[in-house]
Amino acid sequence: MRLLVVAIGRLKNGPERDLAARYRERAVALGKSLGVTACDLTEIPESRARRAADRVAEEAAAILALVPADAAVIACDERGRSDWPSERIAEKIGGWRDAGRGSLVLVIGGADGLHESVRGRADHILAFGAATLPHGLVRVLALEQVYRALTILAGHPYHRGDPEA
């Protein structure tokens, strides 16, 4: 399974970019033993359209053009579900991998959010809480959760989970 993070906008050099790169590199290294062949990041330039609806539609077209037909898709959106613990994310990723899905695409929208066509294509819509977060931070959180999910699948001690479970 190939992992792909598709994000609207480019992170400038700085701590968010460095931390996102660190989690991506960790995911690549650990993923090899789990059948994960890559963890790529594609940054799509923000639309320059005047109207928000036009910007979101243009960005959606660019996002969907990058999503393989057999891909599982997790869309990061503030209107998504925030009740999935890391173990559930790992379970879903492992299930998609074991079912032969060729790719997992994590989508991070732009400042105006995600178009309904992207939300409709998603297998799951994930929120990192009710607060609105900066896109750089969402990228770090998404990549950290990918890495954490892989550690759970590998039985790695990074994720300690619930000691009562």
Swiss-Prot record:
UniProt feature coiled coil, ranges: none
InterPro entries in the record: Alpha/beta_knot_MTases, RlmH-like, tRNA_m1G_MTases_N
Molecular function per GO: rRNA (pseudouridine-N3-)-methyltransferase activity
Organism: Methylorubrum populi (strain ATCC BAA-705 / NCIMB 13946 / BJ001) (Methylobacterium populi)
Function: Specifically methylates the pseudouridine at position 1915 (m3Psi1915) in 23S rRNA.
GO cellular component: cytoplasm
Keyword S-adenosyl-L-methionine included in the entry's annotation: yes
Principal subcellular localisation of the protein: cytoplasm
SUPFAM superfamilies: alpha/beta knot
Compartment annotation: Cytoplasm
Family listed: Belongs to the RNA methyltransferase RlmH family.
EC class (word): transferase
Name of the protein this chain belongs to: Ribosomal RNA large subunit methyltransferase H
Entry EC number(s): 2.1.1.177
